[in-house]
Amino acid sequence: MTNEFHHVTVLLHETIDYLDVKPDGVYVDATLGGAGHSEYLLSKLSPKGHLYAFDQDATAIEHAKKRLAPYIEKGMVTFVQDNFRHLKLQLEKLGVDEIDGICYDLGVSSPQLDERERGFSYKQDAPLDMRMNRHADFSAYQVVNDYDYHDLVRIFFKYGEDKFSKQIARKIEQARQIKPIETTTELAEIIKSAKPAKELKKKGHPAKQIFQAIRIEVNDELGAADESIQQAIDLLAVDGRISVITFHSLEDRLTKQLFKEASTVDVPKGLPFIPDDLKPKLELISRKPILPSAEELELNNRAHSAKLRVAKKVHK
């Protein structure tokens, strides 16, 4: 296990500055990770303000406690070790029914990718795992070895958008008939063997999309994000804001759709007024996603696929 939890925060200032932080407000970092967003947000709060920081990874919380120690001493932080799909439930337990802002940094964090034994990366040999919550029973091993051909094709297409999903699923099926597929390196080699030679010459690792698909399936990432963002929109006070960083098209599409549904209203034309229960809850702060600056892209390779979407609560 690595001793340090290194993580270069993506879109740090944009994500928090767009929240328009109120010094005495109540805020949530739904994806604590390396605590970069939390630390910057806390720097904008007075001792009367409060941050609730969620992460299902105990390691992330332990490291964040060191980084955020000055704010913890002032009683400004509450840590919640749980999947953010339980956002509303956990906040209710803490007596919180309204928040002034919330930020999300979706997907796997850099420390999780870099920690070899977590099995997230196709670049390092490790047991097939990919669990964000280490106490969960379901891992990448079960997906790769227990899912039938049709289920593998389904998740590879749906979550990896890989056009060679059928060929890869077939190769996996053949390989595990000989022996179980146990490591990330074994899986990466099987994926490579299923792709044509000209595909292997293209930029990017040939296993990237499939590893993404398995990771999303293991952690139900899109289902959790869908539930959590909808809960967050309901929890926001009027004028409260939500920031969501995404790293691939599936996350971005989901966020865009949820924001669109909450910021538009479907009423008959010519209606003299819109009833309160039909008024849009959100207003988009930016119609197009906010992208990292050229300077950030130069400093942080992970930022290249990042997109930030922000919205404001305008009606309960």
Curated annotation (Swiss-Prot):
S-adenosyl-L-methionine binds at residues 35-37, 55, 84, 105, 112. It holds the Pfam family Methyltransf_5. One of its GO terms (biological process) is rRNA base methylation. SUPFAM superfamilies: Putative methyltransferase TM0872, insert domain (SSF81799), S-adenosyl-L-methionine-dependent methyltransferases (SSF53335). One of its GO terms (molecular function) is rRNA (cytosine-N4-)-methyltransferase activity. Its main location: cytoplasm. This is Ribosomal RNA small subunit methyltransferase H. It comes from Streptococcus gordonii (strain Challis / ATCC 35105 / BCRC 15272 / CH1 / DL1 / V288).
